[in-house]
Regions:
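Glycine-rich, flexible loop/turn motifs
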Residues: 1-3, 29, 58, 65-68, ...
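Glycine-rich phosphate/pyrophosphate-binding loop regions near the starts of catalytic domains
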Residues: 1-109
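Glycine-/charge-enriched secondary-structure boundary and capping motifs
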Residues: 42-60, 73-76, 139-144, 148-158, ...
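Glycine-rich beta-alpha junction loops
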Residues: 84-86, 107-113, 120-123, 163, ...
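Short loop/turn motifs at secondary-structure junctions
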Residues: 23-25, 118, 188
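Short, acidic (Asp/Glu-rich) active-site segment that either coordinates a divalent metal cofactor
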Residues: 91-155
Length: 246
């Protein structure tokens, strides 16, 4: 699609959301872009996307580099690194998890930068166009679609909807719990998982000997239902690949 309005947001989100999982407050970000040839217009779009993401995450865009590498890279490659901090001894590691602890899920905004190999295979099989109106109703109470086209919402816009940045709700929760004014003690925030590659199986990484059971899952986003149906992907594989709305 060559639509880069959301990729900077995805890049920052993947970094800061990972920091949150150990209880760290993100404070700064640097980016690196490698391209086969200079494209000022594309660079400007990505730069604006990175700046918007840092604004949402309340962090400083501390610097970055763009390298033109003909013969080494054939497509644009964007990467980044975020820096965060937490008080010594306040890291959240999951080692204190116990049987009976409660899982609280936060809604996702879409696919969240993972599972696109399977998405591309399903798209090829379905024959649907990314630039045409979405073949399903994308409305969902827990998210908005960030538009980069006018008119009907396209399938491409839904599948590229930027990753949600969770800094505001989680840092506020962590700070309140540390200050003794939150809904629980900081020691009761025992683990956090960023549902990325591997889907909900990421929860298994939180503890070596504990499993989990979600008896009241968040509503599944409509694009996941469409992908499962058009790709004949079973429920287990969908949950091992995608966040499914959480």
């Amino acid at each position: 699609l060559r639509k880069y309005q959301g990729v900077g947001i995805d890049c920052v989100a993947m970094n800061v959301n990972d920091l949150l999982c150990v209880g760290a407050e993100p404070i700064a970000f640097v980016d690196y872009i490698a391209v086969p040839k200079t494209d000022p217009a594309t660079h400007a779009i990505i730069g604006a996307s990175l700046a918007e993401a840092c604004k949402r995450a309340k962090i400083t865009l501390a610097g970055g580099e763009t390298a033109t590498l003909p013969g080494i890279v054939t497509e644009l490659d964007l990467s980044g690194t975020a820096l965060g901090w937490f008080p010594k001894g306040d890291e959240i590691t999951g080692e204190n998890l116990e049987a009976g602890d409660v899982i609280i899920g936060l809604p996702s905004s879409g696919i969240h930068s993972n599972g696109y190999t399977l998405v591309r295979a399903i798209l090829e099989r379905s024959g649907c166009s990314l630039i045409e109106k979405a073949p399903f109703n994308p409305e969902h109470p827990h998210r908005n679609i960030e538009r980069f086209e006018e008119g009907d919402i396209t399938l491409g816009e839904i599948l590229l909807n930027p990753t949600r940045i969770y800094v505001d709700p989680l840092i506020n929760l962590i700070k309140d719990c540390r200050d003794g004014i939150g809904p629980c003690k900081i020691s009761d925030l025992r683990a956090m998982a960023h549902i990325t590659g591997g889907g909900l199986s990421n929860l298994l990484r939180l503890h070596d000997s504990l499993g989990w059971h979600i008896d009241s899952p968040l509503p599944i986003l409509p694009e996941f239902l469409w992908l499962a149906n058009n790709g004949s992907v079973n429920d287990r594989e969908m949950h091992r690949t995608f966040n499914m709305g959480m």
